[in-house]
Amino acid sequence: MDVSIEKIKNLRASTGAGMLDCKNALEEADGDIDKAVEILRKKGAIKAAKKAGRVTNEGIVYSYIHHNEKIGVLLLLGCETDFVARTEDFHDLAKKISLQIASMNPKWISREDVPQEIIDKEKEIYLEELKNSNKPENIKEQIVENKLGKFYSENCLLEQEYVFGEGESIKDIIDSMIAKVGENITVDKFARFAIGE
């Protein structure tokens, strides 16, 4: 299918992907913008996975203070080169992540960071809730796994749904940026401060 330059430009403006990637995604999606965005997102996740092992020795320490001056965030966002660290897009990403941390108060960066004793305690609580249920053991185990998944999505930054997004997780947003800049990007550390907490 031959796609118009206008559609390619619109897709590029909304995703930040390269012109050729936009053209190919639109052709694959038969001109459907929404399908093309989904294709680009999947390819972005693939690109991000390929770059995940690369070292991020550059980056920025980003600070955010909420307008009421009662919540603040310090974020260490890593990348591979100082060129990317200086871009407006990288700073915008740091701001988005900091807003997420300020509003959703995650406890850990990823599920791998959650201490095993906390996971065990959560499982114990969930199993106790199901103790008197007549459900088979395999169903109980599935319920516990689902509840753990919800626990991770509430408490792990990368798994949280972006507060200003449409079903995207923080990991999805980072993966899109990785695909755009061609470098690995990592959330290395964060700290959230709040008056009265």
Curated annotation (Swiss-Prot):
Report the main location listed first in the record: cytoplasm
Q: Which residues cross the membrane?
A: none
> Any idea which UniProt keywords this protein has?
Cytoplasm, Elongation factor, Protein biosynthesis
List the subcellular locations. Answer: Cytoplasm
Q: Which cysteines are joined by disulfide bonds?
A: none
Q: Which InterPro entries match?
A: EF-Ts_dimer_sf, Transl_elong_EFTs/EF1B, Transl_elong_EFTs/EF1B_dimer, Transl_elong_Ts_CS, UBA-like_sf
One annotated GO molecular function is:
translation elongation factor activity
Q: Where is this region: Involved in Mg(2+) ion dislocation from EF-Tu?
A: 81-84
GO cellular component, as recorded: cytoplasm
Q: Which domain of life is it from?
A: Bacteria
User: Could you say which protein family the record assigns here?
Assistant: Belongs to the EF-Ts family.
Alphabetical list of NCBIfam families matching this protein? tsf
Q: What does this protein do?
A: Associates with the EF-Tu.GDP complex and induces the exchange of GDP to GTP. It remains bound to the aminoacyl-tRNA.EF-Tu.GTP complex up to the GTP hydrolysis stage on the ribosome.
The UniProt entry, under PANTHER family, shows:
ELONGATION FACTOR TS, ELONGATION FACTOR TS, MITOCHONDRIAL
Q: What HAMAP family does the record tag this protein with?
A: EF_Ts
Q: What is this protein called?
A: Elongation factor Ts
Q: Which species? A: Petrotoga mobilis (strain DSM 10674 / SJ95)
